[in-house]
A protein has these predicted regions:
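Bacterial N-terminal signal peptides
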Residues: 4-16
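Low-complexity, acidic/polar, glycine-enriched regions of mature
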Residues: 18-190
């Protein structure tokens, strides 16, 4: 009897102290907004690209978050493009000259520090691995409630060249992808 009670107490304590919550891949995603530049940028297209966040955890009390995105699942959404053009953009994006998602199939983030920044908000610093290169990044995170689940929202910018990616350029550089990308993350826990 005492042994059973001790087991139940230790199990309850371990559950109470376990704060790491898994990310829900069905509801968590990254959306990348790609803009254009160049003399004839009016002839180019803006792109919206998205992928689910494949796995990860959030530990709010410890100020820790880590997640992985399968770069091969990044998909061009662009509703203004026909299917053929969307497939072309998708192929270029995954090619060795841009993401090289065959060689670098994972995009990873691992936090190193989180500082409270108001009610349900934090400034989070961590390491982002993209295109085989890891660099420190700092982001502002806001928490929202969604259908009884916690959703952590991030909007940030990064430069492709910081991660060894050369922005796509056509027509002698008169139409090109901007180096700076806008990234929106929605990290929803289970």
């Amino acid at each position: 009897m005492w042994l059973r009670l001790l087991f139940i107490c230790s199990l309850a304590c371990s559950i109470a102290f376990a704060q790491s919550v898994p990310i829900d891949p069905a509801l968590s995603k990254i959306t990348i907004h790609v803009d254009k530049t160049g003399l004839f940028s009016f002839a180019g297209d803006k792109h919206e690209i998205a992928a689910p966040i494949a796995s990860g955890t959030v530990d709010e009390k410890a100020g820790a978050v880590e997640f992985t995105i399968d770069a091969r699942k990044l998909k061009v959404l662009d509703p203004q493009l026909d299917e053929k053009k969307r497939a072309e953009v998708q192929k270029t994006m995954h090619s060795p000259s841009v993401l090289d998602s065959t060689q670098y199939p994972e995009i990873k983030f691992h936090s190193t520090k989180a500082t409270p920044a108001g009610s349900n908000a934090w400034n989070v610093t961590g390491n982002l691995t993209l295109h085989g290169q890891t660099h420190p990044v700092s982001v502002a995170v806001k928490k929202e409630a969604r259908s009884g689940k916690a959703a952590y929202i991030v909007s940030t910018k990064l430069k492709q060249t910081d991660f060894g990616i050369t922005p796509v350029a056509v027509a002698g550089g008169t139409v090109k992808v901007k180096d700076e990308l806008k990234l929106d993350f929605e990290v929803v826990t289970r």
